[in-house]
Amino acid sequence: MAQDWQLSELLENLHADVQHKLTTVRKSFKHSVVKGDGAENVWVDLFNQYLPERYRASRAFVVDSENQFSEQIDVVIYDRQYSPFIFHYAEQLIIPAESVYAVFEVKQTLNKQHIDAARKKVASVRALHRTSLPIPHAGGVHSPRELIGIIGGLLTLENELKIPDTLMGHLDHDKADKGMLNIGCAADDCFFYYDNDHQRMQVMQHKKATTAFLFELLSQLQKCGTVPMIDIHAYGKWLTPRISE
């Protein structure tokens, strides 16, 4: 016998669950660092539960083959299927730049200060060097895959910029700017994303903002395709030379 379920109810429950967890974190933890960690964990858990298995979400630093590091990123969505290595050092996760699909700053509220902070974090990742090797196949090799555009965003519980035009004014930015935000969500009010078809930022107020945001993120990840084939030797050159016998 078919279950008496409704898709609308399932999607509503997903949004309500995330908003409830974020609200609980905000009310339960007074220490700002603990509160921040709790909110990050809510978003990381959401992504790891609902994104396809090829993706993994974690708090991390990002590194490139030229020994440059990003700032610490609250949520990094990266490729775990084709990534040849992920570093774990002193309880920190360090991910090669080639493996990154998206990076997010997590805050309690959506406002200009936090938008600027998110831009700075996103730019620190996009500025890193990424390699891309030719891809072997049965008939020869494919040309190196074009580098994907790393998605950058901001995730919050509340929106302090309730007037859409005000929020739009703070979000609008040159696409060439490495700190431009492609997407974001204020769980209690809205989500936003850059609409490539119309070449403009869209702010969408929504009762199920978290679920709507997740669907838009999935769409953007699909358009990214697969990360490039990483040049292992570019990283290996940083190995300390062996002492000659």
Swiss-Prot record:
Keywords, ordered alphabetically: Antiviral defense, Endonuclease, Hydrolase, Magnesium, Metal-binding, Nuclease, Nucleotide-binding
Binding annotation for Mg(2+): 74, 105
Broad enzyme group: hydrolase
Keyword Hydrolase: yes
Pfam family, any one: DUF6602
Disulfide bonds: none
GO molecular function per UniProt: endonuclease activity; metal ion binding; nucleotide binding
Stored InterPro entries: DUF6602
Record EC number: 3.1.-.-
Catalytic site positions: 74, 105, 107
The protein's assembly and partners: Forms homotrimers and homohexamers; in the presence of cAAA only the homohexamers of face-to-face associated trimers are formed. The 2 cAAA-binding sites are on the exterior of the hexamer at the three-way junction, there are maximally 2 cyclic nucleotides per hexamer.
Note: Encoded in a type III-B CRISPR locus.
Similarity annotation: Belongs to the NucC endonuclease family.
Protein name: CRISPR-associated endodeoxyribonuclease NucC
Lineage of producing organism: Bacteria, Pseudomonadati, Pseudomonadota, Gammaproteobacteria, Vibrionales
